[in-house]
Amino acid sequence: MAIMQGGQQILAFILVKVAADRLGDTGFGIYMFAAVMSYFVLLLNDLGLVTYITREVSKARDKTTTLFTNGFALKITLLVLSLPFLGVYLYISRSDPEKMRAVLAFGVFGLFSSLNQLCAAVYRGHERMDYEMAVTLFEKVLITTAGMWFVVRGRGVVALCMAFGGASIVSFIINLSLVRLKFLHERAQIRWSVMKRLFGSALAFGLFWIITNVHERVDVLMLERLTNDAIVGWYTLAYKLILVAGLIPVILMTATFPRISKAVHNDPDEVKRIYRLGLKYLLLIVLPMITGTLFLADHVCLFFGEDFGPSGNVLRLLIFASGVDFFSIFFSGFMMARDQQKRLLWLQCAALCLNVVANFILIPRFQHMGAAMATLISRGLIFALCTFWIARSLGRPDYRALPLGVVSTGVMAIFLWKWQGPLFFRIGLAILIYGGLLLLMGGIRPSEILIESKDDDEQKPNTGKP
């Protein structure tokens, strides 16, 4: 999984580099704005179904067919929410035909990504995330190849967005075939009563994810209205880099959520073990990530083109927001496994309101930097309260590895300060220095990195046969 995820991020990095170079800050701003709109389409077509079905399949794998079949029917029904949302924006933005077509193309990507995520819920519930990662990697290869070809050939931002939509359709065909072949071993009927129960049970998750994603992307929407596409491009380049880093806690939460859901009521020691190990390694990742970004932010942003020089300081602020998000995302998995999603929902609502108010105050004065400040303020609120709640239920974190991380980070920082070589050599050597020192001092234990199942039989897919 780690190798596949690394491959995905390399492909995404290459595409962002080519798109930023060829489209410029204005075209790149349109591209990223359309991508943000696709997230809202995806969320309105999901409403928490993926999270809920993942949890329920992990508890009772013999219900996979019923949950998937009725979940799929419910997602088709939910098109009545996502399509009008897209239509309203397209009507409002008629004055900018290029942006309108880009949003429409990414809207297709959002709809089919929602269906792909439903298939991923089955994979996760059966702890077979290798299927998800393989199909996602294939999709990224298609997107990167087609997107680069369109951009290099001068087809523009709309063609680039169409590459995303086309690749998501191909991925859906593959995912649906895999789910039917590997996990659906009986016929299931579509029942209104089951769909209604799924909708009601998943709604709290859905509202949480909608508010979370509005909170994460409202700054882009407000920048687009209060400034211009070039400033949106400066901000979203830094934000895109932060999203890449933010996949680390998402992967950890996704991988551990099914196991936490099963263990939360009958094996509290296993839950605490996952909590301690996950927190330890997130802390050891966040320390060098923030420090390295402070030194290299300008060089990283200028790598994507001279137009993106203003993105450097944005990245320096957002990396702190990303750092606290590492822990908030990881903690949210424990809270949802404990049916505390309503508490998370209220917290996200409060943070969203704070973020909107801060953006209204800061963007007119500081533009892209104001949006970054608002993001850091609201993410800090979420981190503080999530940490307080988790510490009450699972105890204080184990900080014994912290001094080793600080020492290793300090040595790495001295290296970055003194040596001004090529960017990627500096990054690679900094990682080697940090990781090597941690390993030598005993901060990293290879036996801890994989959180292994205590029951090998749990890893085997349920075939429905005795």
Predicted regions and their residues:
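Membrane-water interface segments that mark the loop-to-transmembrane alpha-helix transition
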Residues: 1-8, 34, 43-90, 101-102, ...
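Helix-loop junctions and terminal segments of transmembrane helices
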Residues: 17, 45-61, 124-125, 238, ...
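Interhelical loop/hinge segments that connect adjacent transmembrane helices in multipass membrane
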Residues: 130, 157-158, 173-216, 255, ...
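Membrane-proximal transmembrane or re-entrant/amphipathic helices at the cytosolic face
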Residues: 414-466
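Interfacial segments at transmembrane-helix termini and the short loops linking adjacent helices
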Residues: 26, 90-106, 229, 276, ...
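Hydrophobic alpha-helical transmembrane segments
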Residues: 100, 104-107, 134-181, 197, ...
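Membrane-interface junctions at transmembrane-helix termini in multi-pass inner-membrane proteins
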Residues: 56-59, 112-135, 316-350
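Signature of the first transmembrane helix
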Residues: 1-50, 83, 109, 140-144, ...
